[in-house]
Amino acid sequence: MDKIEIRDLEIFANHGVFPEETALGQKFVVSAVMYTETRPAGLTDDLSASINYGEVSHMITDFLQKNTYKLLEAAVENLAETLLLSLPLLKKITLRIEKPWAPVGLPLKTVAVEITRGWHTAYIAFGSNMGDKKKYLDNAIQGLRDMKEIVVEKVSEYLVTEPYGDVEQDEFLNGALRVRTLLSPEELLDRLHVLEQAADRKRIIHWGPRTLDLDILFYDNEIIDTVELHVPHIDMENRDFVLKPMVEIAPYLRHPALNLTMEQLLKKLEGKTLAV
């Protein structure tokens, strides 16, 4: 990915733990590496096709002078989020804030905090088989749209499916969607749980009826196995109510562990011969 860099931008601002730091202010030095596609601007010589580093420099300065944080960690985190939300062409950013006048009582050149943040692509399966199923799903998708760190990019049609497992229950309404998000996998899972709780989801019977079920199927190309989270979602290759919506919105997306596309996984599940 291409990069545009801003190095050693000096800003006088009021951040720090000690009262004199926020009252008197001091110098901060900011560097940013912005990951984007520069080819469109390179071919057209059109500034609107790129990220204007002059405007970004002023954005950084204004942000750090209008806001006050005790910690560099908080300043750099909030600044990175603001830039990613404000600049449509910015895909990822490495941001460094230095504090050369840090009051530590010892000779040093500088202290600094550097982070890398960016947009991630996630696929989420959704389902409901209690009450007004469509309303539960509609509300959940709108709930995702209302979160500033999430952009809902594509939503499948709702699919009526038979329940999975041995518990006798009503038919499901299922689907899948693709989002861009600034959230980590764990943070995204927490947000999904909040939406489930808002729909009065009760986790009583495994594979039992539920007002709303939201599962992370994929997060970039990552493979995650923790107590709380398994990505790609466990056993999704054996669930047509997951694969059919995924084939609708991302037929050529490849499962990072199985190395088969969504289309190939569905054909395999249905007993069809895969093309070599």
Which sequence ranges carry the predicted segments?
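N-terminal, polar/charged subdomain of small-to-medium soluble alpha/beta proteins
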Residues: 1-124, 128
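Short beta-strand-to-loop capping motifs
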Residues: 34-36, 128, 178-181, 220-221
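Flexible, gly/pro- and Lys/Arg-enriched active-site loops
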Residues: 37-42, 119-121, 164-171, 189, ...
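Short, surface-exposed acidic-centric catalytic microdomains
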Residues: 42-54, 146-184
